[in-house]
């Protein structure tokens, strides 16, 4: 058996060094199979809403997300002009005249409703829709729940991926975020919550501008990681129906990311992911988990260690799905991203809905920004 393994390794290594194109005659069945594959391919759309959401999709265009349509939505024409996307939608042209929502979620909501027809046309045919935004402002907080509700009613698996504002951004933005998150959770199948404050636990001396960039990058990694497990050829891919099974009516979800290049890199990366400050919940009751493993040369034994570690820490009845993406640029590093669904979060309590904040309720607050 060992000799067989050695022979395979030797042959594959030689083939990689001297790739040879094998000429295979094309048949009519091949053409038919290609058409079928194209027809059944999951159509995945990523919608960035508001300033932070548009920054996220702009970054996605830079790094590339295989097999996803990128849509940027904003009320601010000037900001939208700078964004790269497959499609841009300026919402609320009559209401805001392209000047933004002024940190008022109600204006963001009404702007989305005004542009409902254009938004519906953009979402037409989607199997899965990611709605991403930074909560706390006007456009993302107000418009994202409207867009998520549209997508879900149109039959798409709807996953919202959002950040919560830093405490230093003030009480008004915190109240806006609380209101928006409750509405978004009700409008989506799953809402993945990333508390920005937790980034400061990872790197307390991070400059504020860089902290926002890191928050954007985590949003990108979450959406890209899930999408490419479905769309990008990898060592182990996920079927769209696998993802649907975990994220359909998944409720609140949290994300953890870990990586290591040590001798025990697989276990260390898994431990880091589950102990990540971003994973700010007790995951023992999680109803589902999606594991994305990335590396240049992930071994079967390492994948098994990661999956077993995560499985031991969630509900025994939880549905756990996983995939492996080969990323040569990671070299000796293994990266593990874990998204746990169906968790109880202190960020969302479905009691009486918090009314949207107004100028009278939340006076301007002067915040002394600490040195980071």
UniProtKB/Swiss-Prot annotation:
PANTHER family: CELL DIVISION PROTEIN FTSZ-RELATED, MITOCHONDRIAL DIVISION PROTEIN FSZA. PROSITE patterns: FTSZ_1, FTSZ_2. Keywords: Cell cycle, Cell division, Cytoplasm, GTP-binding, Nucleotide-binding, Septation. The keyword Nucleotide-binding applies. Homodimer. Polymerizes to form a dynamic ring structure in a strictly GTP-dependent manner. Interacts directly with several other division proteins. This is Cell division protein FtsZ 1. GO terms for cellular component: cell division site; cytoplasm. Gene3D superfamilies: Tubulin/FtsZ, C-terminal domain, Tubulin/FtsZ, GTPase domain. Belongs to the FtsZ family. One of its GO terms (biological process) is FtsZ-dependent cytokinesis. Residues 353-362 have a biased composition (Acidic residues). One of its GO terms (molecular function) is GTPase activity. It comes from Pyrococcus abyssi (strain GE5 / Orsay). Residues 351-372 are annotated as: Disordered. GTP binds at residues 51-55, 138-140, 169, 173, 216. It comes from the Archaea. It is found in: Cytoplasm. Essential cell division protein that forms a contractile ring structure (Z ring) at the future cell division site. The regulation of the ring assembly controls the timing and the location of cell division. One of the functions of the FtsZ ring is to recruit other cell division proteins to the septum to produce a new cell wall between the dividing cells. Binds GTP and shows GTPase activity.
């Amino acid at each position: 058996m060992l000799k067989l393994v050695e022979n395979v390794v030797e042959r594959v290594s030689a083939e990689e060094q001297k790739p040879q194109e094998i000429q295979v005659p094309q048949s009519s069945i091949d053409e038919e199979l290609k058409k079928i594959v194209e027809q059944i391919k999951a159509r995945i759309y990523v919608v960035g809403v508001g300033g932070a959401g548009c920054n996220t999709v702009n970054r996605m265009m830079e790094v590339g997300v295989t097999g996803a349509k990128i849509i940027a939505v904003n009320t601010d024409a000037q900001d939208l002009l700078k964004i790269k996307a497959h499609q841009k939608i300026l919402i609320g042209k009559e209401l805001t005249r392209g000047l933004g929502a002024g940190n008022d979620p109600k204006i963001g909501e009404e702007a989305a409703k005004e542009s409902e027809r254009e938004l519906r046309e953009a979402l037409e045919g989607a199997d899965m829709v990611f709605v991403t935004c930074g909560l706390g402002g006007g456009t993302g907080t107000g418009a994202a729940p409207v867009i998520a509700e549209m997508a879900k009613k149109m039959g798409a698996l709807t996953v919202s991926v959002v950040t919560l504002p830093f405490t230093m951004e003030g009480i008004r933005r915190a109240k806006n975020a609380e209101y928006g998150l409750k509405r978004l959770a009700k409008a989506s199948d799953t809402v993945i919550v990333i508390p920005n404050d937790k980034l400061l636990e990872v790197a307390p001396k991070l400059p504020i501008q860089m902290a926002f960039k890191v928050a954007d990058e985590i949003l990108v990694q979450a959406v890209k990681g899930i999408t490419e497990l479905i769309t990008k050829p990898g060592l182990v891919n996920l079927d769209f129906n696998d993802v649907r099974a975990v994220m359909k009516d998944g409720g609140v979800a949290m994300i953890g990311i870990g990586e290591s290049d040590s001798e025990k890199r697989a276990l260390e990366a898994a431990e880091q992911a589950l102990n990540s400050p971003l994973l700010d919940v007790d995951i023992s009751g999680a109803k589902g988990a999606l594991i994305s493993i990335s590396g240049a040369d992930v071994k079967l034994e390492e994948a098994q260690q990661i999956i077993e570690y995560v499985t031991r820490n969630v509900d025994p009845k939880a549905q756990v799905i996983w995939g492996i993406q080969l990323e040569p640029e990671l070299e000796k590093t293994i990266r593990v991203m874990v998204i746990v669904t169906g968790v109880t979060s202190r960020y969302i309590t479905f009691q009486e809905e918090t009314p949207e904040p107004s100028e009278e309720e939340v006076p301007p607050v002067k915040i002394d920004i600490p040195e980071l």
